[in-house]
Amino acid sequence: KLANFLGSTVHDVEMTMDVVPHHPYKLRPAAYSVAAAKAVALLKEAGCEVGLQTVASTYNSSYVDALSVFAWACANSVDNWSILRFFPSGRGAAYPEATMTDAQCEAYVHMVQEMVASLPVGHKPEVDFHYLMPGHKKYTSVCRCVRHSIGILPNGDVVACFWALDSSTGAVDPKFLLGNVKGNSLLEILNGEKARYWSDCEHCCELGSGSAPERSVA
């Protein structure tokens, strides 16, 4: 019923699949990919465009893992494959070793690009790399906090970056906490001094930074 409802109300739906179904993966709950696979079939049948999202980490960055997910997406008529960079935030804060370096990300991007170009299949999903993944034309190190995105947590906290969360899903640093919608409107929060720290100046990612890097007024 939910798939039919979505099919009549939204254009596309995206789900996370870091590894193929039934393949163990320590960064996700058991059967996570199995549930995504079931949803893909139901949503395609309901007429939705369907995308898969893979969060690339040191635990799933091998050629075999990438090829398996891409081949599954091809075989199941997935429309889009998005590849994001892993950040040790939220539940992932317990796995800092899963974080890939810029060089590892760039090598992974090139590997996937070559794999997609060379795989002889009839249907291929569009492949979209996250802007913080070096090695492709959309890559930029410029932070998008507040200027392009924010996060709103279940308790009403508004954070400048939805990756800036600790293992208890609180802001990793006070500078990322902009306010709470229980006490102020979202417009008031986004016009506030803490938000202007991010919106008034262009700067690079400050996740894991003990001090603010050089910033420039844009």
Please annotate each region the language model reported:
Residues 37, 67, 106-113, 187:
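Generic alpha-helical structural signal
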Residues 24-27, 92-96, 171-172:
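Short acidic, glycine/proline-rich loop/turn micro-motifs
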Residues 24-27, 100, 143, 178-181:
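Short clusters of hydrophobic/aromatic residues that line enzyme substrate/ligand-binding pockets
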Residues 22, 59, 89-90, 165-168:
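Flexible, glycine-rich phosphate/dinucleotide-binding loops
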Residues 1-85:
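Radical SAM/AdoMet-radical enzyme domain recognition
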